A protein has these predicted regions:
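Alpha-solenoid repeat junctions
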Residues: 2-3, 28-35, 59, 63, ...
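Amphipathic alpha-helical scaffolding segments comprising HEAT/armadillo-like alpha-solenoid repeats
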Residues: 2-15, 33-45, 53, 64-76, ...
Length: 333
């Protein structure tokens, strides 16, 4: 587009025309001159129905803070589609004024718009955070996290709180992991994975044996995804859990955090019963580093037959070329 402020007068005349308004809006959205946004503000007052909704969307696309007053007035419009568009626009603009207006409106909004208003409040809080108004954003995030029942709002509120109040991240994540329901637990797992490499998992691992099985599985998945070697002892203990799902999750994590000391243990698991045998076999094949390779080579000749079979399988799975010299002797046994 090459439109300038000189084009605005001609374009603004097209805004009331239902057939031409779209292209006029498209052009005006992209003209940086102040006169372009003034034309959109004027037109949103003068139009109705789909055309008005389109202009509201254009004001939202420009994140026009100067249109906030007009959009707030439109929250009282009789046309619910217009109201919905105004709600979205106020969220997109994301200032203290629009966030406050959305909070007030949420108390009186019709049921059909409540979730939409909540999502707009979430967008407004994200806008405040981007502008550096972190404490104001955190207040909105906290309300959404603690007061809403719609999962995307609670999840968005928690994510926003951790972003704006990082000193509370451990407390918030611990609560979500140990006290939250499915969506919050899943988010806690994702957020733990996203934390910096030096983020301490120790407080969470201390709670591991006391957590319900689903939460233990979730935390073990975090360990696996982060390859958290410092968690090895906790993971090894979880391999002895009474819960099958926890044992399997721990064995999957051993693939990422196990070491040479775990070779025989995993080989015995692999030689055992399903479903753990497959997980043990995969962990034995996947443990990082060369040390497990050396242990496999050292332990293979003297191992009991079921364990020896699993160590031979691990030779192939890990591509341990030095093991080729041992195989002829194994064929004679």
């Amino acid at each position: 587009l090459i439109g300038t402020g000189k084009s605005v007068a001609a374009l603004s005349k097209l805004l009331p025309d239902p057939d031409l308004a779209y292209m006029a809006r498209y052009a005006l959205e992209r003209i940086p001159a102040e006169v372009a946004v003034l034309a959109l503000r004027q037109a949103v007052i003068q139009t109705r129905g789909p055309t008005q909704i389109g202009i509201i969307n254009s004001l939202a696309a420009r994140e026009d803070e100067g249109a906030a007053g007009i959009l707030i007035e439109l929250l009282a419009n009789a046309d619910q589609e217009v109201v919905g568009a105004a709600v979205n626009a106020l969220g997109k603009i994301g200032t203290l004024k629009t966030a406050a207006a959305l909070e007030r409106f949420q108390g009186t909004a019709p049921d059909s718009l409540r979730r939409q208003v909540g999502m707009a409040r979430l967008a407004a809080a994200q806008g405040l955070a981007r502008r550096g108004q972190r404490s104001e954003a955190a207040k909105v995030f906290h309300q959404l996290y603690t007061q809403e029942t719609f999962d995307p709002l609670r999840v968005g509120g928690l994510r926003g709180l951790i972003m704006t109040e990082p000193t509370q991240a451990t407390e918030l994540l611990m609560a979500a992991l140990t006290e939250g329901d499915g969506p919050l637990r899943k988010l806690a797992v994702r957020l733990l994975v996203e934390q910096p490499a030096d983020y301490p998992l120790a407080p969470f691992l201390e709670k591991l044996p006391t957590l319900p099985a689903p939460e233990q599985v979730a935390l073990l998945e975090v360990v696996r995804l982060r390859s958290e070697s410092s968690a090895r002892a906790a993971v090894r203990n979880a391999c002895d859990s009474r819960e099958t799902e926890v044992r399997l999750a721990a064995l999957r994590a051993m693939a990422a955090v196990g070491n040479a000391e775990d070779v025989i243990f995993l080989a015995k698991v692999a030689a055992g019963e399903a479903p753990e045998c497959a997980a043990g076999r995969l962990a034995l094949a996947s443990m990082p580093g060369p040390e497990p390779d050396r242990t496999i080579l050292e332990q293979l000749p003297g191992a009991q037959p079921p364990v020896r079979i699993e160590l031979i399988r691990a030779l192939a799975a890990r591509g341990i070329r030095a093991g080729a010299t041992l195989l002829p002797d194994q064929l004679s046994q």
